[in-house]
């Protein structure tokens, strides 16, 4: 990717033209994805090249402002707003990875560097000084073997279930959750000692026992509710209100469904513990369901986040600040002229990224809403990448990837989005179209096989925390 620095939005960028490749595209839409006559938010995003391969990255930001971008076996750190990056792993950390994940505890600043070692176990490392030094447990997972799709997160203790002994722990003030799939089951464990070991937990009951074991990230709310999203046909969430001792399930989104193959749905919670669940719908738009009672009930009429001009999407991610203030990222395509044409299997293409032909290109989009809890929320979307992130199909089913000048599974399974303590948004993604692919006039899918780690963050614009107001670019005197 050739872009660096800020993407500055102007009034001309609001013009919507089908199948264009202009650098900046801006949309202001309602809950049906339709354009509304409102001014766009003043969103300026800054790009950073991490300088290493970075498929399925995780991102987190400590209170000091250090950014951690974890992909493959390398915990990359930048403490100068993405100007420079360094691999800060030491000998206590995993030497290789079969599946990476990273997490920054927003309360304690503990940085977790997590790696699946084959399917046998998980090597969990952690740092309490911005990656200056690390500790680690090379065998820190539940029953073995076949532990896959690992995830970790932290959250507050409650006064029920595992929270009763956990709240008395003098070792670490937060609960640490570790989830993975084993065949058709999702297993989640709770740690009383900051992730050094996981003493309690097991297979989650409900949807996770018989409807597929793959799942999205773990999300926690300020009130202690924990969410896990199963990768299932009907959008659903699994949640616990007792620090993982017991779990319940809820479904939503039957009005829009999901595609096949499908990737993870994701949940975010705001400062009042309202929850926002997003997923790719059956028409390949990004959809939202909201809960205002800590996951007990969810609205059954889904809201469309992505503009209708974006006809194919994957890899949605979300985070939230104060009530109604959310940010979402995803990969998407506006090549609507390819709908109904032939896909890579010679069948009629319906927008599924897994089967997209070489005339379809995918960009990175970031969407903001500052009133997402309203009856009529407004979504502000920016296509931030000036050139494609991927040309042609994106493998969404590891058993059906294609060799088109190399595997189209170069991006792997997900991107990531998190906010810092000031409500500034950071997006981690893998760029599959760099160098000649990005600058060429006729780049093809076989040119789009890189997996370069990259990041966008909000340079200036509204914080997701209302009290912060508008953020300015780092180094700006106000």
Regions found by a protein language model. Give the residues of each.
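Secretory targeting signatures
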Residues: 1-20
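Extracellular, repeat-based ectodomains that mediate carbohydrate processing or recognition
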Residues: 15-478
